[in-house]
């Protein structure tokens, strides 16, 4: 119950800060509200159990992009805009776009099941399903390939002879119990205890199955970094540079000479 209240509070705070981004006259205040939006969304993701994306929000958006925007705006001499007719002229267009977005959101929510709405599309048909999003009074049919709470994966259900996976309405001691429906129409009960986090399962996937792609991407980034450094280096050989060793060996007699 406390989790639901915290989720609602952070969602409303994120909506309020989002409105204040466009309502603030001072651009510095707008960027500060943008940072607050990212922080509130981070707390929402942590409550939903998606801690890896929450960390990415803090590191990338808050720690890099938003702070960069803040310093750029503070360095530039931007005048504070007044709320005049030019500002209010764009209110109808903003309301129209917001209405279209909300209509699509509610249509998506009411046309899909709870698992499909809160399930995070992960990779090649995998769905990340958080235990908060599951309605334990029902049994949901989940698409092939499953990542429950970012923890366990059925890599290829068709090869295992499995048509569908049913999540039973049993939740006890941090364990999920799944009914697996086989092609032979027989049903087995699997008691699966999940202890890994989203970050651990992502690290396992990256460094186990996609480690070669990960290394190739790292080498490409390294080459691009070295190439950018080489491009900005000054290759002019006529530039006079100091020789620290020769300067250290000089004394007063060899440095100063008197001429008539």
Swiss-Prot record:
Membrane topology summary: Multi-pass membrane protein
Transport as UniProt keyword: yes
Protein location: Mitochondrion membrane
Molecular function GO terms recorded: NADH dehydrogenase (ubiquinone) activity
GO cellular component: mitochondrial membrane
Enzyme class: translocase
Keywords, comma-separated and alphabetical: Electron transport, Membrane, Mitochondrion, NAD, Respiratory chain, Translocase, Transmembrane, Transmembrane helix, Transport, Ubiquinone
Domain of life: Eukaryota
Reactions accelerated catalytically: a ubiquinone + NADH + 5 H(+)(in) = a ubiquinol + NAD(+) + 4 H(+)(out)
EC id: 7.1.1.2
Gene3D superfamilies: NADH-ubiquinone/plastoquinone oxidoreductase chain 6, subunit NuoJ
InterPro entries assigned to the protein according to its UniProt record, in alphabetical order: NADH_UbQ/plastoQ_OxRdtase_su6, Nuo/plastoQ_OxRdtase_6_NuoJ
Listed transmembrane segments: 2-22, 30-50, 52-72, 101-121, 142-162, 211-231
Coarse class of the protein's main subcellular location: mitochondrion
Family listed: Belongs to the complex I subunit 6 family.
Protein purpose: Core subunit of the mitochondrial membrane respiratory chain NADH dehydrogenase (Complex I) that is believed to belong to the minimal assembly required for catalysis. Complex I functions in the transfer of electrons from NADH to the respiratory chain. The immediate electron acceptor for the enzyme is believed to be ubiquinone.
Name of protein: NADH-ubiquinone oxidoreductase chain 6
């Amino acid at each position: 119950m406390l989790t639901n209240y915290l989720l609602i509070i952070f969602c409303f705070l994120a909506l309020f800060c989002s409105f204040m981004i466009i309502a603030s006259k001072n651009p510095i205040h707008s960027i500060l509200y943008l940072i607050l939006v990212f922080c509130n969304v981070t707390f929402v993701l942590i409550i939903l159990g998606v801690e890896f994306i929450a960390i990415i929000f803090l590191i990338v958006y808050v720690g890099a992009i938003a702070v960069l925007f803040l310093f750029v705006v503070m360095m530039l001499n931007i005048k504070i805009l007044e709320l005049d007719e030019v500002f209010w002229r764009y209110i109808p267009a903003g309301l129209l776009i917001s209405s279209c977005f909300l209509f699509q959101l509610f249509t998506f929510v009411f046309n899909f099941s709870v698992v499909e709405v809160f399930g995070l599309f992960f990779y090649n048909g995998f769905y990340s399903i958080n235990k908060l999003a599951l309605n334990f009074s029902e049994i949901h049919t989940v698409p092939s390939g499953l990542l429950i709470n970012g923890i366990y994966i059925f890599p290829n259900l068709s090869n295992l002879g499995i048509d569908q996976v049913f999540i039973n309405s049993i939740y006890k001691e941090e364990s999920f119990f799944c009914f697996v429906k086989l092609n032979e129409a027989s049903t087995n009960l699997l008691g699966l205890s999940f202890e890994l986090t989203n970050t651990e399962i992502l690290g396992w996937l990256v460094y186990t199955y996609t480690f070669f792609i990960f290394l190739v991407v790292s080498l490409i980034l390294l080459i691009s970094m070295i190439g950018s450094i080489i491009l900005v280096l000054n290759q002019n050989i006529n530039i006079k540079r100091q020789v620290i060793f020769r300067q250290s060996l000089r004394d007063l007699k060899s440095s100063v000479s008197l001429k008539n």
